């Protein structure tokens, strides 16, 4: 049974067979729905400041 994950950065659901799994040196696993989310996370951008993320909408409610 395929597992549907949520994007660590934007909060959207990731369909099976898509996305990017990033494993940190401490063993924690981060899931990203697109290279856009992965690159923004690597640059240190705050997802709460981007209007298209789920974290932004949760903060503004």
Swiss-Prot record:
Zn finger residue spans: C4-type: 7-37
Superkingdom classification of source: Archaea
Pfam families assigned to the protein according to its UniProt record, in alphabetical order: Ribosomal_L24e
Keyword Ribosomal protein: yes
One BP term from GO: translation
Binding annotation for Zn(2+): 7, 10, 33, 37
Cofactor binding annotation: Binds 1 zinc ion per subunit.
Keywords attached to this entry: Metal-binding, Ribonucleoprotein, Ribosomal protein, RNA-binding, rRNA-binding, Zinc, Zinc-finger
PROSITE patterns documented for this protein: RIBOSOMAL_L24E (PS01073)
Reported cofactor(s): Zn(2+)
Gene Ontology cellular-component annotations: ribonucleoprotein complex; ribosome
Disulfide bonds: none
Function: Binds to the 23S rRNA.
PANTHER family to which the protein is assigned, alphabetical: 60S RIBOSOMAL PROTEIN L24 (PTHR10792), RIBOSOMAL PROTEIN L24 (PTHR10792:SF1)
Family per record: Belongs to the eukaryotic ribosomal protein eL24 family.
Subunit structure: Part of the 50S ribosomal subunit. Forms a cluster with proteins L3 and L14.
Protein name per Swiss-Prot or TrEMBL: Large ribosomal subunit protein eL24
Provenance organism: Hyperthermus butylicus (strain DSM 5456 / JCM 9403 / PLM1-5)
């Amino acid at each position: 049974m395929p597992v549907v994950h949520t994007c660590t950065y934007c909060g959207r659901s990731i369909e099976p067979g898509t996305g990017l799994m990033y494993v940190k040196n401490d063993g924690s696993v981060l899931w990203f729905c697109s290279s856009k989310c992965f690159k923004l996370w690597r640059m240190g951008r705050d997802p709460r400041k981007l209007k298209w993320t789920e974290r932004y909408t949760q903060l503004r409610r």
